[in-house]
Amino acid sequence: MTFDSSPIAAIATAPGRGGIGVVRISGKDLSSVMRAVCGADKGSSLQARHATYLDFVNSDGSVIDQGLAIYFKAPHSYTGEDVLELQGHGGPVVLQMLLTRCLEAGADIGLRMAEPGEFTHRAFLNDKLDLAQAEGVIDLIEASTEAAAKSATQSLSGAFSKTIQELVDKITNLRMLVEATLDFPEEEIDFLEKSDARGQLTNIREALQRVFSQAAQGALLRDGLNIVLAGQPNVGKSSLLNALAGSDVAIVTPIAGTTRDKVIETIQIEGIPVNVIDTAGIRDAADAGDEVERIGIERTWAAVQTADVIVHMLDASRGPTRADEQITERFPANVPVMRVWNKIDLSGHRPAIDRMPDATHIYLSATGLLGMDLLRTELLHLVGWQQTGESLYLARERHLVALKSAHSHLEMAAQHAAHDNEATDPALDLFAEELRLAQERLSSITGEFTSDDLLGVIFSRFCIGK
């Protein structure tokens, strides 16, 4: 994202009709816009951080709307620049009229429409928030569960950034000791031994591992899970979807091939959004009823490739078949598989869970709602979810990659530090370099070392008024 410092404006509230709508303007000097849109008298006397009720007017003096004008003087604003917020009625037509008027009034100062995320980008550039906090803004807006919203607030408030910065500071202090040993080899003081550098490194590695665990758990809250129900026709996939959803979202009949296409329902399990994907029953193309069913089976296999967990449905009342084995053989090797034996009300089994070397086996009845809690718990167990009670960070993939990379560099540093090095030993230089790289990887999370291309991708995901 190329930075253009000219003033920007946009509608800051969501599209559609609402009780209140907001037009937001940010720039270095907005006095001419305030006078033009809010009237010469009131527009010239707006007090910072005070709400003033007034008319929003056209160039000919006609009233566009009535509402509140709030002026935030730099640097005490969201963006760190002068900000004017005009709060009027939330109709899309009147808001567009007000925005058009603002752009017209600000033409002489170069006022233009904001790009997506540009207000938050300016807040980042003006040190009002760091990159992890900026991502917390969009994560809070997009949160689909209460747990995800709470975790996003942790990032937005700076808790995640503070934790990362504490790790960076510890690595920096350790680097200073190593650099001192390298720079002053003639000194009799062993800086590394005296300060227990190896012990410090161990503590940093353990702390980083804890942060990664919290971030990985938070990533589940943010991204959710895709659970694909797959198996032969009439083994109870649609019944299981209905049982998980708590309503009849899928049609259930005794007729093989009833489900022709994917049926997706999003549920919550312990605050994690879970997309449960019911699919067409898998059988040989020669046995498929028609072309529509054959296409449905092809889409089943496509869905299986995108799954976080595959739930292989089987009929407990008839036991395993060769067709079940053939389906198993086609599952991706890198995706966890759970074998769910349905219809235990007909087989005489009790609800149970059996963790076998090949897969976890669960015995339940979808129609009788027996063993459903076992299924929910095991789904989260398979993807590493642990209800620890600790605060979680709504981490993104780039955060996890940076944390993993930093941990790898610290592991390498530990290997170099394991030797009793003299100050001239090349391993000590490598020790210092690995610490530097770990520090750099962690700093990329908060945006201290981040490319312009990455910034463009991150902020482009925001809505225009944010």
UniProtKB/Swiss-Prot annotation:
Which organism was this protein described from? Answer: Herminiimonas arsenicoxydans
| Known function | Exhibits a very high intrinsic GTPase hydrolysis rate. Involved in the addition of a carboxymethylaminomethyl (cmnm) group at the wobble position (U34) of certain tRNAs, forming tRNA-cmnm(5)s(2)U34.
UniProt GO cellular component terms: cytosol
Binding residues for GTP: 234-239, 253-259, 278-281
The molecule here is called: tRNA modification GTPase MnmE
Q: What is its main location?
A: cytoplasm
Q: Where is the TrmE-type G domain?
A: 224-384
Checking SUPFAM superfamilies in the record gives: P-loop containing nucleoside triphosphate hydrolases
Q: Which InterPro entries match?
A: G_TrmE (IPR031168), GTP-bd (IPR006073), GTP-bd_TrmE_N (IPR018948), GTPase_MnmE (IPR004520), MnmE_dom2 (IPR027368), MnmE_helical (IPR025867), P-loop_NTPase (IPR027417), Small_GTP-bd (IPR005225)
Q: Which family does it belong to?
A: Belongs to the TRAFAC class TrmE-Era-EngA-EngB-Septin-like GTPase superfamily. TrmE GTPase family.
Q: Which cofactor does it need?
A: K(+)
